[in-house]
Amino acid sequence: MATVGDLKAVVKDTLEKRGVMGQLKARVRAEVFEALDDRSEPKPVLSPENLLINELIREYLAFNKYSYTSSVLTAETGLSEVPLDRSFLTKELNVVEDLNSQSVPILYGIVAHFLKEHEDGPCQKVEKVSTENHTFRNIPRGRNTKDTHSGPVQLTQTSTEDWHQRRHR
């Protein structure tokens, strides 16, 4: 007859194989955060840039079914429970989409666009700066990022398959 320890190990292994263990841990973290969140303390007003960034992240999280992470983001940032409309985001970001790019988060399309741009032509030399655990890139002095991308960002031929192909080159 199996011991309690054996039964626990089998249940744990089964939950991990089904992907449920990660969901349970995320759910517990989200619930703990919700319980500790002081709703009486007003959240700081988000700048328009932070609002757009948070909405792009929320759309990405929803697409990947990271619902508990999304709920923590919403609670921490004070985002409205109702996301901003995608057409509003694309208009604000000066993004032009095609049918393929509409099936994935805007963030995927933006990253794919800049990766393709990098592949298509020479980039200015970017100096890498290392810290203990991270590497950052410094934009060369005198380079104005507004001069680099003055027109709309054209998001085309972006799909999850395309994204994964680019990632594994």
UniProtKB/Swiss-Prot annotation:
It is found in: Cell projection, Cilium; Cytoplasm, Cytoskeleton, Cilium basal body; Cytoplasm, Cytoskeleton, Microtubule organizing center, Centrosome; Cytoplasmic granule. Residues 151-160 have a biased composition (Polar residues). Residues 135-169 are annotated as: Disordered. Pfam families: FOP_dimer (PF09398). The keyword Cytoplasm applies. Residues 1-104 are annotated as: Necessary and sufficient for homooligomerization and localization to centrosomes and pericentriolar satellites. One of its GO terms (cellular component) is cytoplasm. Keywords: Cell projection, Cilium biogenesis/degradation, Cytoplasm, Cytoskeleton. One of its GO terms (biological process) is microtubule anchoring. The keyword Lipid metabolism does not apply. Belongs to the CEP43 family. This is Centrosomal protein 20. The lineage of its organism: Eukaryota, Metazoa, Chordata, Craniata, Vertebrata.
